[in-house]
Amino acid sequence: FSSWNADAVLARYMVDGDKDYLLDMKKDLETEYQRWERTNRLKNGLYWQGDVQDGMEESISGGRRKKYARPTINSYMYGNAKALSCIGILSGDEGMAMKYGMRADTLKNLVENELWNTRHQFFETMRTDSSANVREAIGYIPWYFNLPDTTQKYEIAWKEIMDEKGFSAPYGLTTAERRHPEFRTRGVGKCEWDGAIWPFASAQTLTAMANFMNNYPQTVLSDSVYFRQMELYVESQYHRGRPYIGEYLDEVTGYWLKGDQERSRYYNHSTFNDLIITGLIGLRPRLDNTIEVNPLIPADKWDWFCLDNVLYHGHNLT
C-alpha cells in the first residue's frame, strides 16, 4: 500500500524531538523508498499505483489493476524524498541530503507539469497517454506536502471546495466532483471512491487545506471555510446517536454506507487529533524551537479555547 512513512516519522520528530528514534529509522526508510523506485516508477519518472493499493478502490480516474500516475503516490514520494533529505541533514549525511533533495525537485516538476490539467485547473490522474479528466479529492494531496509552487496558478483549485458542483456537499467533502457524469455510478457497498465521503480523504484534504492557508500567500480560502468543513467533519462522525467512524458515508444524508457491518467500525483512518491540534487550534510543528500558533477559527465563533497538556519538544506547553 502507498504510504508517506518517512514524512510521518519526520513529522513525529518535529513534535517530540526524539532524534535517536528518527536516526534509528533512517536506514529502513531509505530502503523502503528505494523499493518503490524499483517497483513503481514509470519511464517518465512519475510513479504509478493501482486504486486498491492506494486504499481508494473504484475511482472514476482509475481501476483496481490500472497502473496510472496518480497525485497520491507521486505526492507521497515527494514528501518522503523531502523528509529523507532533511534526515540526511540532521544526521550529517550531506550525500543523502543532496540525493533526496534532487529527487524531490524532480518529482515536484513532474507533478506540476504532467499532472496539472490546465483545462480543469486541477491536479489529476494521468492515464497511459492522457489525463483522466476528472477532479478528485486526491488532487489536493500535493498541498499535504507543500509541493506546488506558491503562485496563483495553482490556488484556483481550492475554489472547488466551496462549489456545490465541485466537492461541497451537505455532509462534507466528496471524493470526486459532483458535476461529473460518473459521480456515484459504481454502486454501493464495495469500497467506491467515485464520490461518497471517506474520512480518510477528508482528513488528507483538511491537512492540505491547513498547509495551504498557513504556508501560501493565498486569497481563495478564509478561516470560515476551513471551520465549516471541520464542523461537517466532526458532525458526520456519529451513528445511531453515538460517536462513530466508519468506512464512508453518503454525501447528502450522512448515512454510513456500511454502518451496521462489523468491518466498517474498525476503520480508524481519520487523523482527527492532528486536524484539531495543527489545523483548527493551529500549533504548527517545526524543526527549530519556535512555538508557532495560528488558529483557523473565525473571530465570531469562539470566545476562547484551551488545548491542555500539550507535550512539544520535551516541554508541556499548557
Write out the residue ranges for each language-model feature.
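Aromatic-lined, polymer-binding surfaces characteristic
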Residues: 1-9, 49-63, 70-91, 132-133
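Structural helix-adjacent loops and short alpha-helical linkers that scaffold large soluble proteins
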Residues: 12-30, 85-106, 146-161, 210-230, ...
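Aromatic-rich carbohydrate-recognition surfaces in CAZymes
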Residues: 1-47, 70-78, 195-209, 223-230, ...
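Aromatic (Trp/Tyr) and acidic
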Residues: 64-67, 74, 133-165, 192, ...
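Non-catalytic C-terminal accessory modules of carbohydrate-active enzymes
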Residues: 191, 208-318
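Alpha-helical scaffold segments in carbohydrate-active enzymes
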Residues: 28-42, 76, 83-86, 99-117, ...
